[in-house]
């Protein structure tokens, strides 16, 4: 199991957004040996949220050889302009882009762009096919109920051929795992929505679905994203972070988040990660909620060695 780092695109109230802050974070992740950086996406949220594709483009020159990715709202962004923007990021990163697509769980993101939230799953399936069609240069194109690429020749196309890998988010439902197997190049699981035993059960189902769609389960990658993190030996600080920051942000009870996220001592955090490693998680994207540069260092110095001695 290896590790990536979420970009600090949420304002938790401790520091202002700046290019210098993002750059320092990414350079630190690069120098510490993180394998990838990832920007998650919302148009509006309970806290201010920096635009994900813009943030990702801004840090390319600091990212070295790390993979760069975004878990992006494929429908809300619009599949054609999104495909255009992501193709540019792949070119400017010299082919290091991977794309995470998810419909999102916030109805407000849909309301503000006048898209029916109840249509999201049908639109989502089509949006993925639209992006693949545009990136591959498919002469036939794609025509669905909501979208069509007929007559569109989107240029320039991504550097990576036939396209950057498309990973699909699923919390582990049967329908979601079928979608991952049918349309995806990898599976994005959510840390705060997926306990290790749930991940193990979902991974078993996913492998069955991959066989149905003629894909090799052994070579199909997975990753655990949104692993919010604050490493501290201070028990009172642990409780403050859980109760005052993460519960409000994620709308989950404290006890659930205490079980699932990396909040607490290095030993506690390492034990949680070891459990995910044991059930087949291949990569975990950590998301420090404050003191982010120092938290990256603490993670590498005090947590990772306990997981991978």
Question: What spans do the regions from the language model cover?
Answer:
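Internal, glycine-rich beta/alpha segment that forms the wall or movable "lid"
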Residues: 78-183, 204-206, 213, 218
């Amino acid at each position: 199991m290896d590790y990536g780092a979420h970009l600090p695109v949420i304002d938790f109230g401790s520091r202002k957004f700046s290019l210098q802050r993002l750059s320092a974070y990414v350079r630190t992740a690069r120098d510490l040996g993180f394998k990838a950086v990832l920007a998650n996406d919302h148009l509006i949220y309970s806290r201010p949220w920096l635009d994900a594709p813009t943030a990702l483009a801004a840090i390319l020159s600091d990212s070295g050889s790390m993979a760069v990715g975004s878990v992006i709202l494929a429908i809300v962004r619009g599949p054609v302009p999104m495909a255009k923007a992501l193709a540019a990021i792949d070119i400017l990163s010299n082919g290091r882009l991977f794309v995470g697509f998810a419909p999102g769980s916030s109805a407000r993101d849909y309301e503000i762009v006048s898209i029916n939230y109840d249509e999201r799953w049908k639109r989502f399936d089509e949006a993925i096919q639209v992006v693949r069609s545009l990136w591959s240069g498919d002469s036939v194109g794609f025509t669905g109920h909501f979208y069509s690429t007929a007559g569109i020749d989107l240029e320039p196309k991504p550097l990576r051929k036939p396209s950057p890998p498309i990973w699909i988010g699923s919390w582990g439902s049967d329908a979601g795992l079928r979608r991952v197997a049918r349309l995806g190049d990898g599976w994005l699981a959510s840390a705060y929505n997926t306990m290790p035993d749930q991940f193990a059960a979902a991974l078993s189902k996913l492998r069955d679905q991959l066989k149905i769609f003629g894909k090799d389960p052994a070579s199909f990658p997975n990753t655990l994203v949104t692993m919010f993190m604050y490493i501290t030996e201070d028990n009172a600080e642990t409780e403050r972070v859980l109760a005052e920051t993460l519960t409000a942000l994620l709308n989950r009870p404290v006890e659930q988040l205490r079980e699932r996220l990396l909040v607490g001592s290095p030993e506690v955090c390492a034990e949680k990660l070891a459990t995910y490693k044991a059930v087949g998680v291949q990569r975990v994207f950590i998301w420090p909620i404050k003191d982010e540069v120092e938290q990256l260092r603490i993670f590498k110095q005090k947590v990772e060695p306990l997981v991978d001695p």
